Amino acid sequence: MQIAWALAVGGVVLVLAPKQGWWWLALAIVTGIELLAAWGRRQIVSQLMIPVVMAACVVLVMTLVPRLASQISLALVYIVWRWWWSTGEAGRANLPNLLVLQTMISLAVFLMAVVWRVPSWFAELLMWGLSYTTVLTVMSTRREQSARLLAASWALIVTQLTWLLQIWLFTYTVQGGYVMIPQGVLVITAMGYCFGSIYMSARAGSLSRGRLMEFLAIGIVIIIMVVSGTSWKGAI
């Protein structure tokens, strides 16, 4: 049954999302399937929110990337994730899952900015809303007392990064367009790893100087990547 739900959702995404202008229909059908899957369960909102956000991001990314091979690969990854999500609560509230969610949110938002040229304020609003919702849901699952504060703080950070990185919008593209990764996706994912790891380590009482140096090194790499990999044609 669990794999059936995953295949059903993944099949809808793969068939409809790549078709020009059909992304809204794919999103509506997937939302209906997820609502049916979560119906009658306890905490239906938390059961429904993360799969719908993930599905929406996958639909948008598949609509925006031009190559069928990339779309099929993304659909297969999504099917595996959806099957894993349906297997139970274990692991859902961990840092890797939250990083995957944030990466997909960032990829969808920045590709919309690159391909559809959506207004900057819309991209920032979308990034804030989706980031806040996912972090709040995951942290509430962990029964964090400061879940709202943590979610709002992280949403503010990624919104500010989205504003800044849209000024010099830069995309890493493999020849042929098989892979399109906006620079903002890498920066936000790396920042999420650093902040998330610091928080999780501090909560577990295992934060050390060595770990802090690791995060500092990642931060330096991010700065070098932004400085060296950007065309710097924009203006504040």
Give residue spans per PLM region.
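Transmembrane alpha-helical segments of integral membrane proteins
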Residues: 191-204
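Hydrophobic membrane-spanning alpha-helices of multi-pass integral membrane proteins
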Residues: 154-159, 185-193, 217-224
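Short alpha-helical packing/oligomerization segments
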Residues: 167-190
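Hydrophobic alpha-helical transmembrane segments in multi-pass integral membrane proteins
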Residues: 63-64, 108-120, 159-175, 222-236
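C-terminal ends of transmembrane alpha-helices
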Residues: 46, 165-169, 199
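Hydrophobic, aromatic-rich alpha-helical transmembrane segments
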Residues: 3, 40, 44, 48, ...
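N-terminal topogenic module of multi-pass integral membrane proteins
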Residues: 1-88, 204-236
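Membrane-proximal helix-loop-helix units in multi-pass membrane proteins
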Residues: 69-76, 84-164
